[in-house]
């Protein structure tokens, strides 16, 4: 669904809509879902429709949005559902949104890495961000589109160009890494998964995914062998799903759950309920890298406080150190894409 940014912005302008910075009432939050008809978008839309905190769910995609919206609108929850299809309707979809969730893009297939998606998905995120900058510059933007390590810098650079960038309002959704870690740890140790907390820091691809097993709650001891097996399994969990689906897609259902959980956390923050989530954001938590995922405190303005990585083991510190060059490469690729286009 990649269209030139100028095309999207011009289409919005031609529709007679004008840029405003007024956000929806925090008492009646509007959530815009961009890529709503896709493999992640549809189950994510289903979960957002059931979220009692969402007052207006605006669905956007380049095709098939009316059908998804009609289907979801028959669910007996209070969220109003609107459908927006194609670039001429993107502006209305995101206008005055409190939260914008972006799963739009092509999925991984067997043999592909998240970075292989760059050429297609980079353009999609750039073009969406260009319209968001005009229609809803105060929105909290949650980016699911891979490669997240690069697409977050892409969106940020577009917003910088437009003069509306606020680093507290742009997020890479790494919640799935947390969800997977908590599932795998609870399975291994026989914990109640709903009460297991595993912080995951770094980024959202390969060696940049760093589960902090030393910080698991409730406090849990792991053998070196368990750590050496569990860490790469968490890092490669996405590939595990891609291979299991044998060409039929990537992690859509678990990603939808993770996306809905993070969107709900953002909405709760907007409404004044501060909470802590891991997210990939502009951060100085780790020296030598501009974006890094750590636990952050969410509130009315997005990131209220970056909580950092905390006390880590020697093994985890080695993983963090090794992730920095890889993250910098991913970030530079995203920045260069915007500057070169």
UniProtKB/Swiss-Prot annotation:
Gene3D superfamilies in UniProt: Lactate dehydrogenase/glycoside hydrolase, family 4, C-terminal, NAD(P)-binding Rossmann-like Domain
CDD domains hit by this protein: MDH_glyoxysomal_mitochondrial (cd01337)
GO CC entries: cytoplasm; mitochondrial matrix; mitochondrion
Keywords assigned: Mitochondrion, NAD, Oxidoreductase, Transit peptide, Tricarboxylic acid cycle
pH-linked activity: Optimum pH is between 6-8.5.
Subunit structure as annotated in this protein's UniProt entry: Homodimer.
List of residues binding substrate: 108, 114, 146, 180
Family label: Belongs to the LDH/MDH superfamily. MDH type 1 family.
Molecular functions (GO terms): L-malate dehydrogenase (NAD+) activity
Primary location recorded for the protein, binned into one broad class: mitochondrion
Pfam families: Ldh_1_C (PF02866), Ldh_1_N (PF00056)
Domain of life: Eukaryota
Binding site for NAD(+): 35-41, 61, 121, 144-146, 255
Compartments, record wording: Mitochondrion matrix
InterPro entries xref list: L-lactate/malate_DH, Lactate/malate_DH_C, Lactate/malate_DH_N, Lactate_DH/Glyco_Ohase_4_C, Malate_DH_AS, Malate_DH_type1, NAD(P)-bd_dom_sf
Entry's EC annotation: 1.1.1.37
PROSITE patterns recorded: MDH
Catalytic temperature dependence: Optimum temperature is 35 degrees Celsius.
Function as written in the Swiss-Prot or TrEMBL entry: Catalyzes the reversible conversion of (S)-malate to oxaloacetate in the citric acid cycle.
Active site: 204
Name of the featured protein: Malate dehydrogenase, mitochondrial
Biological process, per Gene Ontology: malate metabolic process; tricarboxylic acid cycle
NCBIfam families associated with the record: MDH_euk_gproteo
Swiss-Prot/TrEMBL catalytic activity: (S)-malate + NAD(+) = oxaloacetate + NADH + H(+)
Alphabetical list of PANTHER family matching this protein: MALATE AND LACTATE DEHYDROGENASE, MALATE DEHYDROGENASE, MITOCHONDRIAL
């Amino acid at each position: 669904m990649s269209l030139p940014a100028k095309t999207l912005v011009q289409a919005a302008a031609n529709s007679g809509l004008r840029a405003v910075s007024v956000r929806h009432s925090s008492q009646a939050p509007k959530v815009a879902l961009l890529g709503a008809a896709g493999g992640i978008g549809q189950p994510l839309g289903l979960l957002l429709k059931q979220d009692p905190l969402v007052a207006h769910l605006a669905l956007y995609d380049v095709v098939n949005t009316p059908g998804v919206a009609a289907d979801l609108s028959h669910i007996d929850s209070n969220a109003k559902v609107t459908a927006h299809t194609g670039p001429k309707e993107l502006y209305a979809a995101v206008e005055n949104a409190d939260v914008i969730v972006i799963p739009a893009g092509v999925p991984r297939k067997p043999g592909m890495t998240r970075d292989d998606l760059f050429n297609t998905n980079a353009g999609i995120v750039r073009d969406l961000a260009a319209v968001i900058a005009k229609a809803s510059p105060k929105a909290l933007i949650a980016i699911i589109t891979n490669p997240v390590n690069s697409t977050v810098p892409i969106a940020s650079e577009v917003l910088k160009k437009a003069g509306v960038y606020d680093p507290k309002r742009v997020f890479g959704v790494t919640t799935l890494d947390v969800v997977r870690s908590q599932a795998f740890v609870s399975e291994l140790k026989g914990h109640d998964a709903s009460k297991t907390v595993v912080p995951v820091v770094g980024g959202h691809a390969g060696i940049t995914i760093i589960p902090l097993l030393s910080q698991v709650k409730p406090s849990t001891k792991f053998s070196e062998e368990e750590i050496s097996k569990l860490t790469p399994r968490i890092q490669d969990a996405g590939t595990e799903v891609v291979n299991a689906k044998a060409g039929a897609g990537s992690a859509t259902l678990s990603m939808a759950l993770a996306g809905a959980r993070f969107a709900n956390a953002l909405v709760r923050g907007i409404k004044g309920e501060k909470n802590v989530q891991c997210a990939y954001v502009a951060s100085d938590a780790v020296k030598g890298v501009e974006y890094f995922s750590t636990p952050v405190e969410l509130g009315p303005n997005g990131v209220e406080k970056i909580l950092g990585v905390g006390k880590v083991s020697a093994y985890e510190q080695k993983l963090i150190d090794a992730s920095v060059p890889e993250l910098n490469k991913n970030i530079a690729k995203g920045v260069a894409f915007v500057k070169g286009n």
